[in-house]
Regions:
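Membrane-proximal intracellular helices of multi-pass ion channels
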Residues: 1-478
Length: 478
């Protein structure tokens, strides 16, 4: 462990992060929204923090180990959430609300404690969207592209930050080139989405803001009514398309764009599984909507949009779903537990893990029926080793245990079971909106619950193992 090297790297990254405040400063000047002092103070304070750290470690040679990689990833998201909370705190929010909002933004969860978005300054609204966009692909992956220029290796950090199978493969020979390719795709999707939003009726401000949170699968909006504010089928269709694109593995986008292999989508088993699961969830939701009586029966348009939004773990809405059949709302919440594809910007357990667990369970059942048979575990045409299956089951076990512990913590704080279950599920899976008391926002829950849920967001963003590893005594043993 090299603490001074870690501090030096943090200082560089915090200094880079401080430059992001230039954008809300420009927005504040354009709209004259009165929030300019907030972002000027934030820019100065965060920049000074980074510069002081750099000065104190100016002669340090960066030599990062595997252990350092884990610490950097975990601590950076914590430091980033704390520094990112400054504008919210200076705007009058409490400390816990500020950290909650910042953590929700940077982890692309989309849960909010703000109950009146339409009354906020434009610069603060834009800042929320910007947090999600930067967190979408992972600020660490962005930093990897510049780390080689600073003499810092990024390979271990890349494997720690990028979830699922994608972290084990290099799309290009060099980590830096991989990060740059992913960010070019990410930026390209954002630009196209923003242009399409604008051409279909959004203002320039709303188009840019919603393009960032759509492609980031974040779910933050500049309006209380979310995407429903625009009441436009074309905007909803665009939103659906880009939520899906961001829920697919970015490795597939890379092969389609850079290698001219669009058929990779059709032949990818995880892609097919995700689409099949989405369609099955949609079919069940439609059947519930048409055959289960409730105070309000949702339209087919509402069901389709909300199903895609929930399964991709985005969290956008086009109408109030609190009066929908509870079975439908619960179904869509469970859909978020499965989540998006590995190598995407979405949350949840991830489709490839679900595939491996289902196939492994099927293999064991077949072994019981045919004890002398030799049955290999396959995903598509590729064999999967038992060590991989064991790792996936280990992840799922820790996931369930973490969920139960977080749920008990929230229940102890006094929240009802429906609200507590959905809040933990929504935050652990980086979804955002829940059911019951947290269906609209998280403003009315107590400070302890907000702290627990902020931790759940971080746990989900780091795919559990990365965070829990550094909490074990063995990790810190020499």
């Amino acid at each position: 462990m090299n603490p001074k090297s870690i501090i030096n790297l943090f200082s560089i990254l915090v200094l880079l992060f401080s430059f992001s405040f230039i954008f809300p400063i420009v927005i504040s000047i354009i709209f004259d929204d009165g929030a300019l002092p907030i972002f000027l103070k934030t820019l100065i304070s965060i920049s000074l923090l980074g510069l002081i750290g750099l000065f104190c470690t100016r002669n340090i040679k960066n030599d990062l180990s595997q252990k350092d990689g884990f610490v950097i990833i975990v601590m950076f998201w914590i430091v980033l959430s704390l520094t990112g909370s400054v504008p919210f705190y200076l705007s009058g929010m409490s400390l816990i609300d500020s950290v909650f909002e910042s953590m929700s933004g940077i982890t692309t969860t989309g849960a909010t404690v703000i109950s009146s978005l339409d009354g906020l300054p434009e610069s603060l609204l834009f800042y929320r969207q910007l947090l999600q966009w930067m967190g979408g692909m992972g600020l660490i992956v962005l930093a990897i592209a510049v780390m080689p220029l600073l003499g810092i290796g990024g390979g271990q950090i890349y494997k720690t930050e990028v979830p699922g199978a994608m972290g084990e493969q290099r799309l290009t020979p060099r980590i830096k080139e991989t990060a740059q390719a992913l960010w070019l795709i990410y930026f390209g999707l954002t630009a196209i989405c923003g242009v399409l939003y604008y051409l279909n009726g959004m203002s320039t401000f709303d188009a840019i803001s919603h393009a960032m949170s759509t492609v980031a699968i974040g779910g933050f909006s500049t309006h209380d009514a979310s995407i429903g504010f625009f009441n436009s089928i074309s905007i909803e269709l665009i939103c659906i398309c880009f939520m899906l694109l961001s829920a697919f593995s970015f490795a597939l986008h890379y092969f389609a764009i850079y290698k001219k292999k669009p058929l990779k989508y059709a032949f990818d088993p995880e892609f097919r599984f995700f689409i099949s699961f989405l369609l099955a969830t949609l079919l069940i939701a439609v059947l519930i909507g048409f055959f289960v009586e409730s105070d309000k029966s949702p339209s087919l348009r509402e069901i389709i949009f909300h199903t895609v939004s929930m399964v991709t773990t985005t969290g956008f809405s086009i109408s109030d779903s609190s009066d929908w059949p509870f079975s439908m709302s619960f179904l869509l919440l469970i859909g978020a537990f499965v989540g998006a594809c590995s190598g995407s910007v979405g949350g949840g357990v991830k489709s490839w893990r679900i595939m491996i667990m289902l196939n492994h369970a099927y293999k064991n059942i077949m072994k019981i029926i045919h004890p002398n048979s030799v049955i290999s575990l396959k995903i598509g045409t590729k064999s999967v080793g038992d060590d991989v299956a064991t790792s996936v089951w280990g992840f799922f076990s820790i996931y369930v245990i973490s969920f139960v512990i977080l749920l008990l913590a929230i229940l102890v704080s006094g929240l009802d079971l429906e609200s507590a279950f959905s809040a933990v599920g929504a935050c652990l899976n980086n979804l955002g909106p829940g059911l019951g008391l947290v269906s609209d926002n998280y403003a009315n829950i107590n400070a302890f619950s907000k702290g627990v849920l902020a931790f759940a967001m971080l746990l989900g963003r780091l795919e559990i193992f990365t965070l829990l590893v550094i909490l074990t005594p063995m990790f810190w043993a020499k």
